[in-house]
Amino acid sequence: MNIAEAEIIVAGGRGLKKAENLEQLKRLADLLGGVVGVSRACVDAGWISASHQVGQTGKTVCPKIYLAFGISGAIQHLEGMRGADTIIAINNDPHAAIFNVADLGIVGDLFEILPMLIEAIEAKHNGAK
């Protein structure tokens, strides 16, 4: 699916720390029926292709839900995702610029929060079967 057409985007930034950590984002995106988006830092680091990049030098997106994990909120990135209906940001820096545009901001460790979200959604999916 083209990221610009996605209704749910699970996005990550430099706070992911390494390419392997994108796997959890992909898992959450799959569970939610969404796609993975990233900040320029992830593309520049070679972790993922530019087709997933959100921002002025990437794609402009307007999803219903934009989940941002470890994205500080550089103006170039924010410009690409401001059209989202609901922005949920998770960052360990309480002063991260992403919180200025987020509808819901969670100050916390994405490496604790992301696995808990995945587990809760998997449990709900398994209970619904």
Predicted regions mapped to residue ranges:
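N-terminal glycine-rich FAD/FM-binding segment characteristic of electron-transfer flavoproteins
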Residues: M1-K129
